[in-house]
Amino acid sequence: MVRADLLDAVDATLRRYRNREKPFGGVQLLMIGDLQQLAPVVRDSEWSLLRNYYETPYFFASRALRETTYMTIELEKVYRQNDTFFLSLLNKIRENKADDEVLNELNRRYQQGFQPPKEEGYIRLTTHNNQAQQVNDRELASLPGKPYHFRAEVTGTFPEYTYPADEILTIKEGAQIMFLKNDVSLEKRYYNGMIGEVVAVNDSEIYVKEKGSEEDFLLLPEEWGNYKYVLNEETKEITEVIEGTFRQYPIRLAWAITIHKSQGLTFERAIIDARNSFAHGQTYVALSRCKTLEGLVLESPLRKEAIISDSVVDNFTKEVERNKPGNKQLSDMQKAYFFDLLSDLFNFYSLEQAYKRLLRMLDEDLYKLYPKLL
């Protein structure tokens, strides 16, 4: 999720290159997201500085955003789940309204010591990295056969903390994996978040398949770019420059992943371990990754303490509810935007600045060289 300081940095950049007088340089801004999911990441060392300028790290504390008139619209149709009963339970969790009845219904999915059938492709969602790593290491070690190691090819500048896949991928035949990218070929054989299995592997080749499928295919390495955006001084256009590349097979071991990494993904079957939830929205994100209630298994009973909500988000959401936009407000804002576009056609700010620079140059340089012009 975008932090307030990042949004203000976007504002500063747009003002610099477009229009200094208007928030975000006069650009129309569209932001899409869910505040009830995981909060923006802020280290303690960062917040010790940011707290002097912001009440909260959430985007709505942005100073630039507060200078604008914006409209908040709630999208209500859910596409991941079709079961209205499951949706009602998830919404109670999402809105921090989970009572004993909701918890009891969800805890029906608790299965002590559950051992998932290998062919069904269950994935375990954990709260911490070390938990997921332990599960994956244990499951990989339990497989027979030789482990194979594949090192990523990194060129140019590509910071280690932004690596999109393992620098050294270790797999065996039979390993459960998750794809990390969409297949851009015509075959469209895999997508980001799809669960699969390693069918065969040697020093130079990996054959994989989707879980539950009989059709396997040769997996090829994929390339990710580390991009930088620079301003072309001649054309005044922003151009994309690749600073570095990261090339690796687009998979990782996936008997378990963290809830944080699961955000945005959808699973047919998942085992949820939320007993150590520590962040706003964490439990909701974990539960809502699963398409059906039947595909969900709880590794431990769900407790109220694991459902953590941020009062700052709750207050913002209530304010949005109280000020739902109507058709008139939408129409008025559309008219105001078109008026701004029209006004920009008669904005001579850049000419005014050029004229001021000319006067300064005459005053500071020309008259010193040619004093008789005075």
What does each model-found stretch correspond to?
Residues 1-374:
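Conserved ATP-binding/catalytic motifs of P-loop helicase motor domains
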